[in-house]
C-alpha cells in the first residue's frame, strides 16, 4: 500500500498575488528618502537577477526594476555595483535569465553552465560550431585579453569585409562571446553599451574565484531555491524559468528541496499545476504599491505566470510591425493596488527634454480617480528620474483625457 501523501496547503489567487508581490520587493513600504548603495545591493540580492536588454526607448532595462521598487535612485549606484573595481563591485554579468546582472555570490552556482558552454552545450549552435572549429582564434583572443586587460571586440577586429551572419559579428567578437559563455573571461566594464572583457580573477573578488567547486546538482538546486525565494510562489515551470534551467534537473532539484524541508508544495486556486513556496511563508494582508514595470521585470517576465497571477495578457510589440500593434511600441504595465491596472506606451524624447505618453490603456474595471492620480504621479516622477523636464500626453483616448485632468489637479504641467 503506497505511503499516504501529506495534505497540501491551499491558497487563493489573491493570496498568491500578494505573496509574489511581497517576495519581489513590492511590500507597500515607502521608498527610502535617500537611496544608498546598500539599498540597491540588498534589493538585487533579493531579486537574484536583473535582465539586460539593448532597447533604449526609455532607459536601459536593467535600471527600471530598481526604480519601480526604490523610486528616484541615482543610476550610478547600479553602475558602481555592476562595473566598478574593488569593494564596490557587487555584481557580475552572465547568462542568468537572459543576459543578466547577478550578485557575485551566485558566480559559483553558474560554473556548471560555463563548463557546459565550453563543451558546446546550452549555447547557440553557430557559437558551438565556432568553438569546435576556431580554437586558434579563441586562443589568440584570450591571449590578447591576458596581455592587454579589459578590452572590447572592436579593439581586436581584424575583419576587412562584412561577415554576414551572427549580427555581422567579427570572428574576434564571436570568440569573446564564446570565452564569456565558457567563463574564461567576464565583463570588467562597459564603454557606452559595449562590453569590455577581462579575466575573471582580475575582476571578481578572490573569495568568489577561489570558492570550492560545486557539484552541478547542488548548484542547480541552490538556484532553484533562490528562484523560489525571489518569486514567492510558482509552478515548476515558473521556478526553472527564473534562471533558465532545464526541466529534468529542475524537477529532481525541487523534489529534493521538498524532501529536505527547504520548500513545500502547495495548491493555488485555479492553477492546474502544483506550486512551490517556502515552508514558513507569510501572506501580507494587502499590498499598496504603485509602479510602472519594465517589460523585462522579473515580476512579469514569465508571461503565462503573469496571466495566472494578474489575469493580464502581455506581449512586447517592439518587433511587431507598426500597423499590427495593439497597444504600442514600448508598453509598460502599471501596477496599482495588487493588480496590473493599465498599460502605458512611453518614450524618452531626450532631444526635446520630455517623456512622451503615446497611449494609455486601462485594464478592466479601469482606474478609479485615486488610481489615475497615482499614474500621473508615477509618470511625473519617472520624468524627473530620467532628467526630462516635460511630460507630453500624445494620445486621444478617453483614458488619456482622464490622465490630463489628473495632471492638472495635482499641479503637474504637461504638453
List PLM regions with ranges.
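Long, charged, low-complexity, helical-prone intrinsically disordered regions
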Residues: 1-415
Amino acid at each position: 500500500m503506497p505511503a499516504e501523501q501529506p495534505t497540501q496547503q491551499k491558497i487563493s489567487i489573491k493570496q498568491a498575488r500578494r505573496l509574489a508581490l511581497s517576495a519581489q520587493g513590492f511590500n507597500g513600504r515607502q521608498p527610502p528618502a535617500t537611496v544608498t548603495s546598500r539599498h540597491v545591493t540588498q534589493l538585487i540580492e533579493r531579486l537574484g537577477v536583473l535582465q539586460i536588454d539593448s532597447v533604449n526607448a526609455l532607459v536601459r532595462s536593467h535600471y527600471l526594476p530598481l526604480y519601480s521598487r526604490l523610486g528616484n535612485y541615482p543610476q550610478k549606484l547600479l553602475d558602481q555595483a555592476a562595473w566598478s573595481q574593488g569593494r564596490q563591485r557587487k555584481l557580475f554579468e552572465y547568462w542568468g535569465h537572459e543576459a543578466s546582472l547577478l550578485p557575485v555570490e551566485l558566480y559559483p552556482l553558474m560554473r556548471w553552465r560555463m563548463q557546459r558552454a565550453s563543451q558546446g552545450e546550452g549555447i547557440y549552435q553557430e557559437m558551438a560550431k565556432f568553438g569546435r572549429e576556431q580554437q586558434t582564434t579563441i586562443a589568440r583572443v584570450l591571449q590578447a585579453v591576458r596581455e592587454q586587460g579589459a578590452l572590447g571586440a572592436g579593439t581586436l577586429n581584424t575583419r576587412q569585409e562584412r561577415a554576414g551572419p551572427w549580427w555581422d559579428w567579427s570572428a574576434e567578437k564571436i570568440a569573446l562571446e564564446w570565452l564569456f559563455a565558457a567563463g574564461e573571461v567576464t565583463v570588467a566594464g562597459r564603454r557606452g553599451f559595449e562590453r569590455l572583457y577581462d579575466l575573471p580573477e582580475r575582476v571578481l573578488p578572490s573569495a568568489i574565484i577561489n570558492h570550492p567547486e560545486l557539484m552541478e546538482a547542488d548548484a542547480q538546486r541552490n538556484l532553484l531555491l533562490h528562484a523560489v525565494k525571489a518569486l514567492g510562489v510558482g509552478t515548476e515551470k515558473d521556478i526553472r524559468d527564473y534562471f533558465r534551467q532545464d526541466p529534468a534537473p529542475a524537477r529532481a532539484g525541487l523534489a529534493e528541496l521538498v524532501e529536505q524541508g527547504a520548500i513545500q508544495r502547495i495548491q493555488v486556486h485555479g492553477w492546474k499545476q502544483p506550486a512551490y513556496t517556502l515552508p514558513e511563508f507569510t501572506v501580507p494582508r494587502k499590498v499598496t504599491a504603485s509602479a510602472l514595470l519594465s517589460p523585462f521585470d522579473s515580476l512579469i517576465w514569465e508571461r503565462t505566470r503573469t496571466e495566472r497571477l494578474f489575469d493580464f495578457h502581455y506581449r512586447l510589440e517592439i518587433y511587431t510591425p507598426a500597423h499590427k500593434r495593439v497597444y504600442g511600441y514600448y508598453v509598460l504595465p502599471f501596477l496599482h493596488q495588487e493588480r496590473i491596472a493599465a498599460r502605458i506606451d512611453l518614450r524618452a524624447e531626450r532631444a526635446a527634454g520630455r517623456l512622451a505618453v503615446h497611449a494609455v490603456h486601462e485594464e478592466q474595471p479601469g482606474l478609479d480617480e485615486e488610481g489615475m492620480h497615482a499614474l500621473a504621479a508615477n509618470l511625473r516622477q519617472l520624468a524627473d528620474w530620467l532628467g526630462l523636464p516635460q511630460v507630453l500626453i500624445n494620445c486621444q483616448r478617453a483614458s488619456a483625457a482622464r490622465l490630463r485632468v489628473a495632471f492638472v489637479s495635482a499641479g503637474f504641467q504637461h504638453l
